[in-house]
Structure formats: C-alpha cells, structure tokens
A protein has these predicted regions:
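Glycine-rich flexible loops
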Residues: 1-152
Length: 152
C-alpha cells in the first residue's frame, strides 16, 4: 500500500483481506448502518427472500470481535474472505473486497440496500422466502452467481 496519506489504524485488516484475495486490488471498511447492526449482534446474514442477495452473497458471515487498531481486528479474515466478498466484523462494521475500490463499495451498497428492503418488509408482514429448489435453479441459471464464482 503506497501513497502519502496517513495509514488507517486498521491497515492490518486491509492487508489481511488483500493477502487472502490476490484477485482483488481494493478493500473497503465501512460502518454501514444495517450491516453494522448485524455485526453488533454477531449474526451471519442469510436471506432467502431476495434473488439479489442470493445471487450476489448467498450469506455474509460475521467474525468474532477483534480489537480495532491491533492485529486481532483481522482474526479469521483470511479464511472467511477467501469465499466471500463481504464480511461482517463482530461489534464493529464490515469489510468488502473488489477489483477496484468502487467495486468494493458497490458490494457494501448492494447488501445495505437489500437489508433496508428486508427490514421494511418485516414491518409490513411475514417475509416470504424463496424455496430451496427455486434457489438452486436460480444459482444454476446464473453463471455470475456467488456459488458459481467460488465453486460452492
């Protein structure tokens, strides 16, 4: 990481994420409200009601709390981010990786938008999930789906 701008106290987090993902050139660490709320609760995000979420993410794992500004903020990041473009950081926020910084930020924005809609939906009534068989068909018919990108 080069340049004259002062490095973030969480530079170790960015370095660990990029080390694990040589296909990516940028990492974005943001405290987006909905994603951070899940991080505060220590909850993975698994939604079956949104085709967008299912195709792009399928799930967003949440790592345990790691002390910011120390190496512990990056505990578990290398394993988790190998198979995910977006990870929640327990009691903290989130980090996404992408080929460019714009790509990494767009990943966070997409997840945040889906979560806004999901929580509005819960206010209106029960959320109706997409069946597992329909989700399998969705994954199989979209070569760009997360499952097809990572082979899982």
């Amino acid at each position: 990481i080069e340049g004259t701008v002062k490095k973030s106290s969480e530079i170790l987090l960015h370095e660990a994420a990029l080390k694990a993902r040589p296909d990516c050139n940028a990492a974005a660490h943001i405290h987006a409200p909905y994603l951070t709320a899940y991080a505060y609760c220590g909850k993975d995000i698994k939604l079956k009601c949104s085709t967008t979420f299912s195709l792009v993410f399928e799930e967003i794992p949440c790592l345990p709390y790691g002390l910011p500004g120390t190496i512990h903020i990056a505990d578990g990041i290398e394993d988790a981010i190998k198979d995910h473009d977006l990870i929640l950081l327990g009691n903290h926020g989130c980090i996404a990786v992408g080929k460019t910084l714009e790509d990494a930020v767009k990943i966070i924005e997409a997840a945040e938008e889906v979560l806004k809609i999901y929580h509005l939906t819960k206010e209106i009534g029960p959320v109706r999930n997409i069946s597992d068989s329909d989700l399998e068909e969705l994954y199989n018919n979209h070569p760009g789906s997360r499952r097809n990108r990572y082979g899982k």
